[in-house]
Regions:
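Conserved phosphate-donor
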Residues: 1-18
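Phosphate-handling active-site elements
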Residues: 15, 40-54
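Conserved N-terminal beta1-alpha1 strand-loop-helix module at the mouth
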Residues: 75-172, 177-204, 231, 241-244, ...
Length: 300
């Protein structure tokens, strides 16, 4: 098949981890895998996540020498440097009359947001790249993650931190082949079946929604509500699926704590922040609710 799957069996659960099947088999890479897992455990990753990242490492290691002979290339930055569980607020850009996207991003970053997704559905490629260059610089200055919505090619050209893929966009396995294992790849989900598919496709996080009606999307999937989130998160726990999950879609401020109580690890916001006159202050207020563990300041 197209996927190579490893399994972790513990007294409490069985976890499956899949990556795109490489040209060559994994025979002889056991020492590499065990060393990688041990390294991720040392960094504080839970065992299932350490195994998943170790599998990523081995997959990149195998691909570092296409002949499968002699020395393999040194593997550097084979996984995103930021633990996404510790960045539970994501801002998704949208058009706002009188306030440019770079101005929006500057405001939310000043308020403490450390994850921005550039979403410009109505813009052409040239405008997205031009805006993306400015947004990337703002994110770098504030130590924030910079992801591009939908377009893998643009994410590659901008050297973004990653890409978020909708259900009808490129397969995450193909995006991983193009972007590499050091980039963040997120995927949209509306059902538990979607989550299983994305998990098998080795996304780094899931955008789960919509929570309720939202004006930022023209084609809306079925609304989940708190009950929908609870059912999906319960199923994830039962099946041993460990991924950061961000709720998205029409979230209001008084929805945040009930949503987090379902087991969702974060939220993605657009209108709630964008429509506030003081975006920086509103961002700070939301972050205080989320009790975010702040990222270290950017180097240099």
């Amino acid at each position: 098949g197209a996927l190579a799957t490893d399994r972790l069996i513990t007294p409490d659960n069985t976890y499956s981890f899949s990556v795109a099947r490489a040209k060559h088999g994994k025979h002889g890479t056991g020492c590499v895998l065990s060393s990688a897992i041990a390294s991720y455990l040392t960094l504080g990753y839970p065992l299932p996540d350490a195994c998943r990242q170790g599998q990523h490492y081995v997959a990149g290691f195998i691909r570092s020498n296409d002949t499968n002979l002699g020395m393999h290339n040194r593997m550097e930055n084979t996984t995103p440097e930021v633990d996404l569980y510790h960045v539970p607020l994501q801002y998704i850009t949208d058009h706002k009359e009188g306030v440019s996207i770079p101005e929006q991003v500057e405001a939310v970053c000043k308020g403490g947001c450390r994850w921005v997704q550039l979403r410009m559905k109505e813009a052409d490629r040239e405008e997205i790249i031009r805006t993306g260059c400015v947004v990337k610089e703002i994110c770098r200055r504030h130590g924030a993650l910079f992801l591009v919505n939908d377009n893998v090619d643009i994410a590659l050209e901008l050297d973004a931190d990653g890409v978020h893929l909708g259900k009808e966009d490129m397969n995450p396995l193909e995006a991983r082949r193009i972007l590499g294992y050091s980039k963040i790849i997120g995927g949209t989900c509306n059902t538990f079946e979607d989550v299983v598919d994305r998990f098998r496709q080795q996304v780094d996080y899931i955008g789960l929604g919509p929570f309720t009606y939202t004006t930022t999307k023209k084609r809306l999937s079925p609304i989940l509500g708190l009950e929908g989130y609870q059912k999906i998160m319960d199923a994830c726990r039962k099946e041993g699926i460990h991924l950061p999950v961000h709720a998205i879609g029409g979230i209001r401020e008084n929805d945040i704590q009930p949503i987090l109580n379902t087991g969702v690890t974060g939220i993605a916001l657009s209108s709630l922040l964008k429509n506030n006159k003081d975006m920086a202050r509103k961002t700070k207020d939301i972050i205080e609710q989320l009790k975010i563990k702040e990222l270290p300041p950017p180097s240099g």
